Amino acid sequence: MGWSFIFLFLLSVTAGVHSEVQLQQSGAELVRAGSSVKMSCKASGYTFTSYGINWVKQRPGQGLEWIGYINPGNGYINYNEKFKGKTTLTVDKSSSTAYMQLRSLTSEDSAVYFCARSHYYGGSYDFDYWGQGTPLTVSS
């Protein structure tokens, strides 16, 4: 009886470790003005197609700016008007990875960019897990 309890306990602990939600973002980028960059956000520990992925910008000393949202399940994308034409959001379901491409880069694009998971809510996004952030520096 004791051994079976220990086995079940260890099994549940192991399952918990493997199911930990993580959003792992690509590393820091240093790019020239006028160029493009594509950063990634690899999800693990949950069903990728059951939650949305948001992208958020934070410039030094400033607040968070929501860039946009993509639903990996059906491909729906919602952009902040300010970032339309600047940003393209995509996903690769086979690798549970979300991507954000930024083009025509200027010094104003230098910032840390975060991905964040959210539930599907019409018109509002409840972020529950965040990536560690990808710093982007645009040099002239």
Swiss-Prot record:
Q: Where is the signal peptide?
A: 1-19
Q: What biological-process terms (Gene Ontology) are attached?
A: immunoglobulin mediated immune response
Question: Does this entry carry the keyword Signal?
Answer: yes
Q: Which domain of life is it from?
A: Eukaryota
A Pfam family per the record: V-set
Which InterPro entries does this one have? Ig-like_dom, Ig-like_dom_sf, Ig-like_fold, Ig_sub, Ig_V-set, IgHV
**MF terms per GO, please?**
antigen binding
Instruction: Provide this UniProt record's keywords sorted from A to Z.
Output: Adaptive immunity, Hybridoma, Immunity, Immunoglobulin, Signal
What GO cellular component is one of the record's annotations?
extracellular region
Tell whether Signal is among the UniProt keywords: yes
- Alphabetical list of PROSITE patterns matching this protein: IG_LIKE
**Any idea where the Ig-like domain is?**
20-139
Q: This protein is called what?
A: Ig heavy chain V region 93G7
What organism, scientifically named, is this protein from?
A: Mus musculus (Mouse)
Lineage per the UniProt record: Eukaryota, Metazoa, Chordata, Craniata, Vertebrata
